[in-house]
Amino acid sequence: MLSHSIVTHPGARPTRACLVLHGILGSKTNWRTLARRFAAARPEWAFVLVDLREHGASQGLHPPHTLDAAAGDLAGLAAALDLPVRGVLGHSFGAKVALRFAADHPALSHLVVVDANPGARPDRRGSEASLAALDTLDAIGAEWPTREAFLAAVMAAGHDRGMAAWLAMNLEHASAGFRLRVDVAAVRSLLDGYFQADLWSVVEAAPAGRRTTLILGGASGVMDAPELARLDAVAARGGCEVVVVPGAGHWVHVDAPDATVAAVVAALAPVSAR
């Protein structure tokens, strides 16, 4: 089963669960602070922070490492939880996994996509930083005497300290110091699936009774003008809601946490409140 942790508001008795999915090379801890704020505002929800396959503590899962497999992992997790999964929120790669999961679960009442393109992206536009990070991890090796040595190597490859610190979250203690716990080849395979999958149908033909919300960074490049127009057309006929966070880049929740919390809290309102 996927590694996960559950966030609820103290004293609350939630009646449903929302899966929270990180982006590529992330982990379940990425959304912990914001999840506490979500739970405070929506105590009826439990927020299940997930380590997707080959990320965080969810290592060693059987291949193939595909988008379908990642969504299947979620189905297994959902079946094991005490609360019914009625919502799923994902950022970037995690959002694409959320869309794939939603395609197979019509009873899902809430779908929140954070800065991800529902369509295929053969040009890999907007994910340059993640691709560069994978190239760096391939180039610098997996074992390090100290965390600082790893940080220095990542920065020497052209990344800033913030990116280096983020990548260092994938280090674990080893006999000789630290080692990278992720299988870079497996992560590349997952990312290939992310770019290849076209899941516009999940947004454009959502089942009745589902609230779909897309939260986009105003300064992000994951969607071009025609794709934004296509999304606006879906929103105009009531098929989804679109929230653009001005000035925020791809990591919307990092650049604008307050705006992200407000958007997610609104997105998780009862469907009858539309």
Description of each model-found segment:
Residues 5, 9, 32-89, 93, ...:
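Active-site loop/oxyanion-hole signature of alpha/beta-hydrolase fold enzymes
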Residues 19-23, 216:
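The conserved beta1-alpha1 loop
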Residues 23-26, 92:
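Active-site glycine-rich loops that stabilize anionic/oxyanionic intermediates
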Residues 25, 52-56, 118, 249-252:
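Alpha/beta-hydrolase active-site loop signature
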Residues 99-103, 108-144, 224:
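Flexible "cap/lid" loop of the alpha/beta hydrolase fold
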Residues 142-195:
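Conserved alpha/beta-hydrolase catalytic His-Asp/Glu region
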Residues 175-235, 241-244:
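Conserved serine/cysteine hydrolase catalytic core
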Residues 245-257, 261:
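Catalytic histidine-centered segment of alpha/beta-hydrolase-like enzymes
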